[in-house]
């Protein structure tokens, strides 16, 4: 959904045909505990047999992961695809780099052999290759997986490559039917892998519902359209209650039931983002938990730092931890910035001073050098310009990174106009450069896990393509990012959003170099669709 739509005009608070409409929003739960939610009558309780175990770590003031024992035995995902012959000449060898595989905790100077699209050997001894890359002093990591991007557009994905991304997943929602999304992505022939979630609001627009309250019949039609997209390969279902102002709780439940049936995540931009009163954001998180509880679906909360956890991250993490302890499957992602951006005409900017406790001087239009003035603001809203709001704190980012179920998602892709948030070009390099190297908030392995193995595991149960990605292991797909840990950094700012990151030296997608020696190779287009497996 483009974020410039306004609230429905002249709407009553939902049609009378929805007797349970907006359950949580109207309950006044405030910061209600999950225990209270459990006592509410639901009529349906999911069978949570075999549900993910609750996290072993608890939220603390320190976000640095506890040290893990170093593993120096080369990992193998599939021994049948591994090559053990010492005389073998690999297609590509990445020689002498620090190989970090968060999925196995392997972290050692080693040599990676690649044949075709597959990693076939990891060795502590030198290997022979037709092409050998000197990776000494560099980190050899699984290719980064962006779980919260937007569809490839022929331009922005090359900035993703420079940021180390090999798989661009639009769990924020695709902008068409799944069939049309795949057709357009194939036409663009991208360098990165691609996939996405069906977007409930796009179907609302096609049906003419837009931001209005949907009738029961329309809700069923929306669920049927989501089902068709999932059957066509969509990896999840996306909804954004904050922007879809006529979205009733029944509609969330209907889509949650589809998500549960196909075991894909229901990806939510939560209903509330304003930090004052704190009870509103708590209700947004509670609503997501309630959907998981009633339907049994998996929930993925989008950009928790800007929606649900702003100014209250410790409490938001505690809410999710409590739900996970009950056996519910809930994850989240964040981007490592303290400002969000959306279009000035969006309802999110209605009464923004009261909502977020900020003023005009905390706003900045993308690709302009100065903060906004009160005199300029009416014109900016009328022109619907992309505007950043400096409305978060560092604790909103670092507090989320303390939770082991939080991964990284950019929530952006650069367009040719350059009109975007700098997270579109620098999200992953910023995490490694600022939050690992400069501030020591995360260990290198922990940071890499949040952009590789965690997103792979989120989706590998429904997409076998993801079961072989996010890993540096023999038998894994050779999606690999090689970067300099001493220089990797984001270079974009809100004043200049279209600057490529620095420090990513080599990127391979399916064993083919799309970036080598710090330069993108635009002749290489090996990206493949990442789809839900057919039944």
Where are these regions (language model features)?
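N-terminal secretory signal peptides
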Residues: 1-19, 43-48
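N-terminal export leaders
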Residues: 19-25
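C-terminal segment of N-terminal export signals and the immediately downstream linker at the start
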Residues: 38-95
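Histidine-rich, glycine-flanked metal-binding segment
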Residues: 71-93, 98-141
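Divalent-metal coordination cores built from histidine and acidic residues
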Residues: 80, 135-140, 145, 149, ...
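Acidic, glycine-enriched loop/beta-strand segments at the rims
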Residues: 82-84, 100-111, 397, 439-448, ...
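Active-site neighborhoods of metal-dependent hydrolases
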Residues: 206, 210-213, 222-245, 290, ...
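C-terminal cap of metal-dependent C-N hydrolases
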Residues: 390-391, 398-405, 410-413, 477-526
């Amino acid at each position: 959904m483009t974020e410039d739509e306004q609230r429905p005009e002249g709407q009553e608070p939902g049609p009378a045909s929805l007797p349970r409409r907006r359950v949580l929003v109207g309950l006044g739960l405030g910061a209600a505990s999950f225990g209270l939610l459990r006592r509410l009558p639901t009529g349906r309780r999911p069978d949570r047999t075999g549900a993910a175990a609750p996290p072993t770590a608890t939220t603390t003031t320190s976000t640095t992961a506890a040290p893990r024992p170093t593993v120096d035995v080369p990992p193998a995902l599939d021994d049948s695809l591994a090559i053990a012959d010492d005389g073998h000449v690999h297609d590509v060898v990445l020689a002498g780099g620090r190989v970090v595989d968060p999925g196995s905790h392997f972290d050692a100077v080693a040599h990676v052999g690649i044949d075709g699209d597959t990693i076939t050997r990891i060795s502590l001894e030198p290997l022979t290759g037709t092409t050998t890359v000197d990776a000494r002093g560099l980190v050899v990591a699984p290719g980064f997986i962006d779980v919260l991007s937007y569809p490839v557009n022929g331009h922005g994905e090359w900035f993703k490559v420079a940021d180390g991304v090999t798989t661009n997943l639009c769990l924020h929602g695709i902008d068409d039917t799944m069939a049309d999304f795949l057709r357009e992505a194939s036409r663009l022939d991208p360098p990165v892998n691609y996939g996405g979630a069906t977007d409930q609001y796009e179907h609302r627009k096609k049906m003419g519902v837009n931001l209005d309250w949907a009738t029961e019949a329309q809700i069923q039609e929306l669920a049927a359209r989501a089902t068709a997209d999932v059957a066509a390969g969509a990896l999840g279902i996306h909804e954004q209650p904050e922007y879809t102002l006529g979205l009733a709780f029944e509609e969330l439940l209907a889509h949650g039931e589809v998500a549960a049936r196909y075991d894909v995540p229901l990806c939510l931009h939560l209903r509330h983002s304003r930090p004052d009163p704190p009870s509103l954001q708590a209700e947004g998180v509670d609503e997501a938990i309630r959907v998981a509880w009633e339907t049994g679906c998996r929930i993925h909360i989008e950009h928790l730092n800007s929606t649900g956890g702003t100014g209250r991250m410790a409490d938001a993490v505690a809410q999710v931890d409590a739900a996970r302890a009950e056996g519910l499957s809930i994850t989240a992602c964040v981007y490592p910035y303290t400002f969000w951006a959306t279009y000035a005409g969006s309802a999110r900017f209605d009464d923004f001073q009261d909502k977020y406790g900020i003023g005009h001087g905390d706003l900045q239009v993308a690709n302009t050098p100065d903060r906004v003035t009160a005199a300029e603001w009416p014109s900016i809203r009328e022109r619907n310009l992309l505007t950043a709001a400096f409305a978060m704190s560092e604790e909103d980012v670092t507090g989320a990174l303390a939770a082991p179920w939080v991964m990284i998602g950019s929530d952006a892709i650069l367009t040719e106009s350059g009109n975007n948030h700098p997270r579109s070009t620098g999200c992953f390099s910023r995490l490694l450069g600022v939050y690992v190297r400069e501030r020591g908030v995360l260990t290198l392995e922990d940071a890499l896990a949040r952009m590789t193995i965690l997103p792979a595991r989120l989706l590998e149960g429904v997409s076998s393509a993801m079961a072989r990605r996010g890993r540096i292991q023999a038998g894994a797909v050779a999606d690999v990012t090689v970067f300099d840990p001493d220089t990797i950094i984001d270079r974009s700012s809100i004043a200049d959003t279209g600057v490529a990151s620095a420090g990513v030296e080599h990127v391979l997608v399916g064993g083919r170099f799309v970036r080598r020696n710090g330069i993108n190779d635009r002749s290489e287009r090996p990206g493949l669709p990442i789809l839900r497996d057919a039944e």
